[in-house]
């Protein structure tokens, strides 16, 4: 989104948060609204438009750099340096000169910024552009989109290819994004001769401004595409295949370049951000790149030693339990955990937990009683050294 558009928009209000809201509060507010307004969950057209606005707000406020620029821009136009005056956003980059001399607004802005805060020239560079002349305005890049994906634990750990269904502005399939009727090309603007700018003189000053005939694009579409009405964009439902990388964690945000909202008249598309939600697994857990599992064992398996068959992400592995292992001990199997982004795998951490039988009968009962007697005779005291 261009900075010049920030002046008229209150992103905090759109998300229902205060201007000093924490990143976590902004994230929670966006998720709540997105789940209700997403076109797949709410077919109302107004909900779709609102979803785009909410996504724009989150895209700016969730980025620390963009949020700072947004706050500075809003404060500047709220009545500070510019006294609350509104500026026509049709102005692009501009400069003024006369009698061979130039008046550099950036010098004024840089001096003003020395009182503290963001360089005001930088802000105006985004709002009106910098330079000695106007450049032809390019069609604006499409907005970024936000969506969510629910994954099973194993899918998140190993990675998965999955389809995502999106309803959003996309390049018009009829004109392929040009905005012109198929077979007819846009013509060069005769007012500005394709430059996109008009040079004017006022007294001692000369300045340039965007051409109002072609709106700074340098070309005019005389015969607009009937499908998109000349915008090059239509709203449609599309399905894209997304590769979720291995090792993603719950709440992680994945960027897919160029998969967002289409830009007007052939401009580049925005990006798609996918927030991953991982469903808990009844067997596996995770500690960073380590895979965790708690396995029930009998007392005799710990006391006498044994080999356990333990599940992993890729089948089972035999884990040796040393003789005399304590309940709750963690056994490590190297390289059998979650795939790492840098290559290789984390470890498998196996916690052994004794399962006590509720009822013993017959030979098992007698054998355990005999063991208890032998244990007492040996002088073994499990609470030796414990307590005060």
UniProtKB/Swiss-Prot annotation:
<dbReference type="GO" id="GO:0005737">
    <property type="term" value="C:cytoplasm"/>
</dbReference>
<feature type="binding site">
    <location>
        <position position="172"/>
    </location>
    <ligand>
        <name>Zn(2+) 1</name>
    </ligand>
</feature>
<keyword id="KW-0863">Zinc-finger</keyword>
<protein>
    <recommendedName>
        <fullName>Chaperone protein DnaJ 1</fullName>
    </recommendedName>
</protein>
<feature type="repeat" description="CXXCXGXG motif">
    <location>
        <begin position="189"/>
        <end position="196"/>
    </location>
</feature>
<feature type="binding site">
    <location>
        <position position="175"/>
    </location>
    <ligand>
        <name>Zn(2+) 1</name>
    </ligand>
</feature>
<dbReference type="Pfam" id="PF00684">
    <property type="entry name" value="DnaJ_CXXCXGXG"/>
</dbReference>
<keyword id="KW-0963">Cytoplasm</keyword>
<comment type="similarity">
    <text>Belongs to the DnaJ family.</text>
</comment>
<comment type="subunit">
    <text>Homodimer.</text>
</comment>
<feature type="binding site">
    <location>
        <position position="228"/>
    </location>
    <ligand>
        <name>Zn(2+) 1</name>
    </ligand>
</feature>
<feature type="binding site">
    <location>
        <position position="214"/>
    </location>
    <ligand>
        <name>Zn(2+) 2</name>
    </ligand>
</feature>
<dbReference type="InterPro" id="IPR002939">
    <property type="entry name" value="DnaJ_C"/>
</dbReference>
<comment type="function">
    <text>Participates actively in the response to hyperosmotic and heat shock by preventing the aggregation of stress-denatured proteins and by disaggregating proteins, also in an autonomous, DnaK-independent fashion. Unfolded proteins bind initially to DnaJ; upon interaction with the DnaJ-bound protein, DnaK hydrolyzes its bound ATP, resulting in the formation of a stable complex. GrpE releases ADP from DnaK; ATP binding to DnaK triggers the release of the substrate protein, thus completing the reaction cycle.</text>
</comment>
<feature type="repeat" description="CXXCXGXG motif">
    <location>
        <begin position="225"/>
        <end position="232"/>
    </location>
</feature>
<dbReference type="GO" id="GO:0005524">
    <property type="term" value="F:ATP binding"/>
</dbReference>
<feature type="repeat" description="CXXCXGXG motif">
    <location>
        <begin position="211"/>
        <end position="218"/>
    </location>
</feature>
<dbReference type="InterPro" id="IPR036410">
    <property type="entry name" value="HSP_DnaJ_Cys-rich_dom_sf"/>
</dbReference>
<feature type="binding site">
    <location>
        <position position="211"/>
    </location>
    <ligand>
        <name>Zn(2+) 2</name>
    </ligand>
</feature>
<feature type="domain" description="J">
    <location>
        <begin position="10"/>
        <end position="74"/>
    </location>
</feature>
<feature type="binding site">
    <location>
        <position position="192"/>
    </location>
    <ligand>
        <name>Zn(2+) 2</name>
    </ligand>
</feature>
<dbReference type="InterPro" id="IPR036869">
    <property type="entry name" value="J_dom_sf"/>
</dbReference>
<keyword id="KW-0862">Zinc</keyword>
<dbReference type="InterPro" id="IPR018253">
    <property type="entry name" value="DnaJ_domain_CS"/>
</dbReference>
<dbReference type="GO" id="GO:0051082">
    <property type="term" value="F:unfolded protein binding"/>
</dbReference>
<keyword id="KW-0235">DNA replication</keyword>
<dbReference type="GO" id="GO:0006260">
    <property type="term" value="P:DNA replication"/>
</dbReference>
<dbReference type="InterPro" id="IPR001305">
    <property type="entry name" value="HSP_DnaJ_Cys-rich_dom"/>
</dbReference>
<keyword id="KW-0143">Chaperone</keyword>
<keyword id="KW-0479">Metal-binding</keyword>
<feature type="zinc finger region" description="CR-type">
    <location>
        <begin position="159"/>
        <end position="237"/>
    </location>
</feature>
<dbReference type="Pfam" id="PF01556">
    <property type="entry name" value="DnaJ_C"/>
</dbReference>
<feature type="binding site">
    <location>
        <position position="189"/>
    </location>
    <ligand>
        <name>Zn(2+) 2</name>
    </ligand>
</feature>
<dbReference type="InterPro" id="IPR001623">
    <property type="entry name" value="DnaJ_domain"/>
</dbReference>
<keyword id="KW-0677">Repeat</keyword>
<dbReference type="GO" id="GO:0009408">
    <property type="term" value="P:response to heat"/>
</dbReference>
<dbReference type="Pfam" id="PF00226">
    <property type="entry name" value="DnaJ"/>
</dbReference>
<keyword id="KW-0346">Stress response</keyword>
<feature type="repeat" description="CXXCXGXG motif">
    <location>
        <begin position="172"/>
        <end position="179"/>
    </location>
</feature>
<dbReference type="GO" id="GO:0031072">
    <property type="term" value="F:heat shock protein binding"/>
</dbReference>
<dbReference type="GO" id="GO:0008270">
    <property type="term" value="F:zinc ion binding"/>
</dbReference>
<feature type="binding site">
    <location>
        <position position="225"/>
    </location>
    <ligand>
        <name>Zn(2+) 1</name>
    </ligand>
</feature>
């Amino acid at each position: 989104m261009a900075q010049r558009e920030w002046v008229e928009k209150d992103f905090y209000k759109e998300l229902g948060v205060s201007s000093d809201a924490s990143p976590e509060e902004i994230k929670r507010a966006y998720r709540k609204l997105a789940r209700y307004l997403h076109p797949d969950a709410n077919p109302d057209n107004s909900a779709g438009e609102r979803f785009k606005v909410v996504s724009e707000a989150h895209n700016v406020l969730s980025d620390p750099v963009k949020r700072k620029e947004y706050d500075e821009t809003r404060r500047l136009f709220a009545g500070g340096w510019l006294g609350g005056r509104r500026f026509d956003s049709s102005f692009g980059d501009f400069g003024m000169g006369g009698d061979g001399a130039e008046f550099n607004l950036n010098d004024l802005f840089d001096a003003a910024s020395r009182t503290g805060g963001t360089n005001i020239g930088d802000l105006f560079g985004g709002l009106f552009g910098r330079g000695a002349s106007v450049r032809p305005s390019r069609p604006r890049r499409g907005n970024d989109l936000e969506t969510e994906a629910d994954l099973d634990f194993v899918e998140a750990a190993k990675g998965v290819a999955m389809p995502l269904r999106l309803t959003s502005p996309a390049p018009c399939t009829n004109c392929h994004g040009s905005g012109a009727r198929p077979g007819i090309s846009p013509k060069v603007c005769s007012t500005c001769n394709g430059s996109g700018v008009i040079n004017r003189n006022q007294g001692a000053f000369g300045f340039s401004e965007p051409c109002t005939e072609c709106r700074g694009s340098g070309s005019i579409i005389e015969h607009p595409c009937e499908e998109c009405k000349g915008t090059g964009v239509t709203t449609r439902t599309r399905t894209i295949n997304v590769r979720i990388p291995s090792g993603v964690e719950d709440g992680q945000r994945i960027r897919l370049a160029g998969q967002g909202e289409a830009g007007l008249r052939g401009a580049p598309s925005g990006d798609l951000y996918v927030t991953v939600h991982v469903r808990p697994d009844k067997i596996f857990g995770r500690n960073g790149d380590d895979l965790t599992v708690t396995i029930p064992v009998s007392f005799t398996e710990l006391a006498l030693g044994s080999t356990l068959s333990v599940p992993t992400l890729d089948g089972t592995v035999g884990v040796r339990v040393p003789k005399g292992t304590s309940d709750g001990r963690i056994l490590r199997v190297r390289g059998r955990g979650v795939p790492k982004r840098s290559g290789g795998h984390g470890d498998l951490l196996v916690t052994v937990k004794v399962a006590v039988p509720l009822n013993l009968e017959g030979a098992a009962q007698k054998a355990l009683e005999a063991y208890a007697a032998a244990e007492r005779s040996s002088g073994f005291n499990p609470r030796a050294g414990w307590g005060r």
